[in-house]
């Protein structure tokens, strides 16, 4: 099993969520996060003064999937989150050793 973590633009969340759900990947965790990368910060104005905001609001989507589903999940996220501009995000794939359903204590791939 693998955990897929995708950091994407907030405005792309709904379309990515729908595409994943339509493909059968309904279990996910979504968090509001802030970060920076190549895109750097942005300049905002407040009461006539300019401020550099160096941490940009993003959304993190986390899914645990079967290893054979990882490439499909990555393709779905990329196809639906891409704008072609810096700041589109990153995807991380992390090994998962164990999954346990809290309610029943069942374990393994079947609890996904």
From Swiss-Prot:
GO terms for cellular component: cytosol. ADP binds at residues 29, 37-39, 64, 87-90. One of its GO terms (biological process) is regulation of nitrogen utilization. Coiled coil: none annotated. It comes from the Archaea. ATP binds at residues 29, 37-39, 64, 87-90. Belongs to the P(II) protein family. Homotrimer. Interacts and forms a complex with Amt2. This is Nitrogen regulatory protein GlnK2.
């Amino acid at each position: 099993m693998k955990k897929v973590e995708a950091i994407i633009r907030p405005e792309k969340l709904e379309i990515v969520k729908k595409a994943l759900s339509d493909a059968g990947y309904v279990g996910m965790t979504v968090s509001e996060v802030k970060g920076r990368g190549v895109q750097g910060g942005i300049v905002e104005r407040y009461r006539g003064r300019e401020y550099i905001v160096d941490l940009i609001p993003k959304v993190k989507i986390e899914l645990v999937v079967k290893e054979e589903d990882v490439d499909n999940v990555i393709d779905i996220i990329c196809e639906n989150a891409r704008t072609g501009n810096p700041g589109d995000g990153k995807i991380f794939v992390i090994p998962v050793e164990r999954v346990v359903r809290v309610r029943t204590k069942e374990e393994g791939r079947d609890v996904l």
